[in-house]
């Protein structure tokens, strides 16, 4: 049990996919200007990342490995992710049209979010079992969501702040992301 808790804490804080592994930077910078959009994207990404991680594990264990089709791993994982994203988009469109409009192009772009594919591939490389794969996917999603929501809240405050002209927009966003990354480096000794 403690092994699973350590894996979760490690994935959320210590080895955060955005700030440590630099995966998922496109939605991190693109959707983080408004807190409402960031929360919606976080929920959608959490669902997609967790489900895609579990399904990728199952595809790998029960299709690719038994038939010695390891060379199709990346392509099959992308297909799994695309199916999960399409399912998520249909659910979001039916349940919340406003959220669907707010997320815009970023919802279908979860398919190409390298963090989602990265989690699936790292699950295989690190030889996680089913429960570890689910926890790793969920932890990566929670870490992504945490960073995205914190960053979007900071960007909203920065939009109202008196920032010098050369630093407005993307420049101050990159500086803020760098400072967040430094803050998350403080968690490095938390899990060994």
From Swiss-Prot:
Membrane topology: Multi-pass membrane protein
Domain of life: Bacteria
Keywords from the named record: Cell inner membrane, Cell membrane, Electron transport, Membrane, Translocase, Transmembrane, Transmembrane helix, Transport
Main location: membrane
GO biological process, one term: electron transport chain
EC assignment: 7.-.-.-
Family note: Belongs to the NqrDE/RnfAE family.
Subunit (UniProt): The complex is composed of six subunits: RnfA, RnfB, RnfC, RnfD, RnfE and RnfG.
Name recorded for this polypeptide: Ion-translocating oxidoreductase complex subunit A
